[in-house]
Amino acid sequence: MKTELTLLDHSYELLRYPAENQHVSWQAWDSADEYLMEYVAQNITDLNGLNIHIYNDDFGALGVWFATNNAPLWISDSFVAHKALALNLERNHLPIENVNVQNSLYKANQKADLVLIKVPKTLALLEQQLIDLQSSVTPETRIIAAGKANAIQKSTLALFEKHLGLTTTSLAKKKSRLIFCQYDGVKQSVSPYPTKWKTDNTQFIMSNLANVFSRQQLDIGARVLLAHLPDANHKCIVDLGCGNGVLGLHVLHKSPGAHVIFVDESFMAIASAKMNIEQNMPDKLDQCKFIVSNCLDECLSSGENEATVDIVLCNPPFHQQNTITDHIALQMFKDSKRILKHAGELRVVGNRHLDYPQTIKRLFGHYKVLASDRKFSILSAIKK
């Protein structure tokens, strides 16, 4: 993994998080980060005293770069990004207090002089952030976004125009592009989030904040797993990578005595999962915990939760930010083995083309296919 960012007479050591699970060809910043850093350095002569707001910094590169400028406000929905920022500030001998770190549920009320946005993969998240910005920007605020050129579509620019004002773009450089926007001082939008839909049989109303995976409908993998939920009455269950919490919610419906731990690395996902328990089964709220974590790191960090769980349900993602990877699923499976009791079960749904069966067999010594269709398989492994 390339770790040294050298640009404009500055040099920083930057790691992706978790560093030990990264491919040697990956790095903690991209050409869009570099383009944004260069543009600001060459076009805004004095950053001292400016209120800087930073959104969607994948692994803390922007946070580190601007950390010496008046404690910029740094907002991300990703717990992994939060951990990466803390790691990279420490590696570069910069106090965490140099950055005002907040999650995506934070509504900024301080006025911004300069807003820097990495365009997220989910346009709904971008839309929510642009709406939120209406309360903290003025026509004098400089708003600059950066992203891969092929990810900046007409629909991306239309969101800036719709919610803020006049929008233009730069030329492409190293396959990245900048977006420049000026707030017109007039637009005040009502957020369309959370989006809501009903589950088929139980008719639960599912609320989904902007960055929740499959926020408009039940995703196919979860649909398959819902038909094969275990009997979990009076057992402790982890809904790992819970998203809006639809699996854990149905566990509580099927097994009223279950205790469910909802875990996700998205702050919006955890907030949505809690909202969905509160709205659909409020009497079960005291049987639930909601934890923002990279896989099960936060559950296992103290060691006291090892071997305490009966069942882990898992619908693993195969992206980290914009990178396709299997390391998240691998860590989820390893963490699941640690947190499960003797004879506890890991139950996984995944695309059939993925190598989950052999990975699980290496860790648990065996696996069983509970069900499968043309696209998905449900795998079960018992901890011995």
Curated annotation (Swiss-Prot):
It is found in: Cytoplasm. It is an enzyme of class 2 (transferase). One of its GO terms (cellular component) is cytoplasm. Its main location: cytoplasm. It catalyses: guanosine(1835) in 23S rRNA + S-adenosyl-L-methionine = N(2)-methylguanosine(1835) in 23S rRNA + S-adenosyl-L-homocysteine + H(+). The keyword Protein biosynthesis does not apply. The keyword Lipoprotein does not apply. SUPFAM superfamilies: S-adenosyl-L-methionine-dependent methyltransferases (SSF53335). GO terms for molecular function: 23S rRNA (guanine(1835)-N(2))-methyltransferase activity; nucleic acid binding. CDD domains: AdoMet_MTases. Keywords: Cytoplasm, Methyltransferase, rRNA processing, S-adenosyl-L-methionine, Transferase. InterPro entries: DNA_methylase_N6_adenine_CS (IPR002052), rRNA_m2G-MeTrfase_RlmG (IPR017237), RsmC/RlmG (IPR046977), SAM-dependent_MTases_sf (IPR029063), Small_mtfrase_dom (IPR007848). Its EC number is 2.1.1.174. Belongs to the methyltransferase superfamily. RlmG family. PANTHER family: RIBOSOMAL RNA LARGE SUBUNIT METHYLTRANSFERASE G, RIBOSOMAL RNA SMALL SUBUNIT METHYLTRANSFERASE C. Specifically methylates the guanine in position 1835 (m2G1835) of 23S rRNA. This is Ribosomal RNA large subunit methyltransferase G. It comes from Pseudoalteromonas atlantica (strain T6c / ATCC BAA-1087).
